[in-house]
Amino acid sequence: MTHAAYPAEVPERGYRYLGDEVRRGKQFPRAEVEAAIARYFELAKHGTTTGDWNPWADLFTDDAIYVEHSFGVLHGREAIRQWVTTVTHSVPSDLDIVGQWYLIENDVCAVYTPNRRPAPDGGEPYQFIGFSVFIYAGDGMWCYEEDLTNTGEIQRVNAAHADAARPAGNQQ
């Protein structure tokens, strides 16, 4: 099954780990991988604040695989670019995607990622959690990403944020 707006495949029998299909099998210095993680989140911030996700998409190799359990499996940088510009509508937002902590085992990274939106009243932010697995390809690029999120949590948090952002007396 595929989605009409972007080239993602949704496996009928469920997801399986696809990282080994693109893994390079090379050793990388930890500092290089950490710098690539920092750059990834820097460009994600650029994407959310400007609506321009092209620099972020350019972090992926031509043969990258991106598994987004809510949307499907994407093959290649251009499919990833088409997906992210479709789902974000290339519109700036107040979403802050933060790599709070990570584990690195050579080229494989596991990252705990709160996705935060500021509270309209200035209080605690609204957030939903993501957990991602990345495979580093070298030269600052990624050949694999798999995002795990709870779509129910995303919908609940976004609805609560939208309700809080409406002017008092206009809660429809």
Could you say what each language-model-derived stretch is?
Residues M1-D58, D62, A165-R166, Q172:
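Short, low-complexity N-terminal intrinsically disordered segments enriched in polar/charged residues
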Residues A8, I129-A165:
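Short beta-strand edge/turn micro-motifs at domain boundaries
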Residues I37-A44, F60, I80, V84-T88, ...:
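Hydrophobic alpha-helical core bundles mediating ligand binding, dimerization, or RNAP-core interactions
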Residues Y40, D52-A57, A64, G76, ...:
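Hydrophobic pocket/interface hotspot
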Residues W53-D107:
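A solvent-exposed, acidic/Ser-Thr-rich amphipathic alpha-helical stretch
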Residues R77-E78, D121-E124, E153-A160:
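A short, polar/proline- and glycine-enriched secondary-structure boundary/capping micro-motif
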Residues V84, I97-L103, N115-R116, I129-I135:
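Hydrophobic/aromatic beta-strand elements that line small-molecule binding cavities or substrate pockets
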Residues H89-S93, R116-Q127:
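Short, cysteine-centered beta-strand-loop-beta hairpins and adjacent loop/turn segments enriched
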